[in-house]
A protein has these predicted regions:
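Conserved ABC ATPase "signature" region
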Residues: 116-135
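A short, flexible loop at the N-terminus of ABC-type nucleotide-binding domains that lies
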Residues: 2-10, 14-27
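Conserved ABC ATPase signature
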Residues: 139-143, 147
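Catalytic Walker B motif of ABC-type/P-loop ATPase nucleotide-binding domains
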Residues: 164-168
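ABC ATPase C-loop
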Residues: 156-157
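Conserved ABC transporter NBD signature motif
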Residues: 64-73, 81
Length: 227
């Protein structure tokens, strides 16, 4: 069960586009507890991706405040914050090189040097994902969209963040691979269920039911249910 203290809290978040005189996010308030699994659902254009990017502090806010462990997120805490709150894009960016080089890449940065690359863990996850070990030697340039998503997911999970923000991580995958991703993420969560938190955007209602302790429903830039 999640702790009572929010690990992330959004208070009245808003995103405004002057050119269109439109609020893309409006009055979004949300508490995310440590150890919680949240799935965000809603129609296309409802603000699901923008919500995740805002929770990751990747886009500027025009209203409201984001809090991490009770402290307002500002530019002064961003490197530490982003090492603990990791966002997985629908179209992840990979460096030129092999899958293995992409997985090892984050560990050169000081915010991740307290962690280590765990080859045995990666091999286990590859088996769950029904991928052969030689997948690690594949060039990032030769990866399909689904394989790139898998690579980025493995890279994110091995960093053991406090919060993993997943933007439709199975959208480009076949059903068997999607099932493997669900199993991987569930295993990752269960390794430390009191400390790890997942916020997952999905268009699949059955997937949402499987993966969520709580569902948020978005419409027209607002959370209309579940907050």
């Amino acid at each position: 069960m999640p702790d009572d203290e929010p690990i992330l809290e959004a208070r009245e978040l808003g995103r405004y586009v002057p050119a269109t005189n439109k609020w893309l996010l409006q009055h979004v308030s949300l508490e995310v507890a440590a150890g919680e699994r949240i799935v965000v659902v809603g129609p296309s254009g409802s603000g699901k991706t923008l919500l995740l990017r805002s929770l990751a502090w990747l886009d500027p806010l025009d209203a409201g405040t984001l809090y991490w462990r009770g402290r307002a997120v500002t530019r002064h805490v961003v490197p530490r914050f982003r090492s603990r709150v990791v966002y997985l894009h629908q179209r992840p960016a990979l460096i030129a090189g092999t899958v293995a080089e992409n997985l090892q890449y984050p560990f050169q940065f000081s915010v991740h040097r307290s962690r280590r690359f765990d080859a045995a863990q990666i091999e286990h996850w590859l088996r769950v994902l029904r991928r052969e070990p030689d997948f690690l030697q594949k060039s990032s340039r030769d990866l399909s969209g689904g394989e790139a998503q898998i690579t980025a997911l493995l890279r994110a999970m091995q960093l053991t963040p406090d919060v993993l923000l997943l933007d439709e991580p199975t959208a480009a995958l076949d059903p068997a691979s999607a099932q493997g991703v669900e199993q991987c993420v569930s295993q990752w969560f269960q390794e430390a269920p009191q400390q790890r938190t997942i916020v997952w955007v999905s268009h699949d209602q059955e997937q949402a039911a499987r993966m969520a302790d709580r569902q948020l429903v978005m419409a027209a830039g607002r959370i209309v249910q579940g907050a």
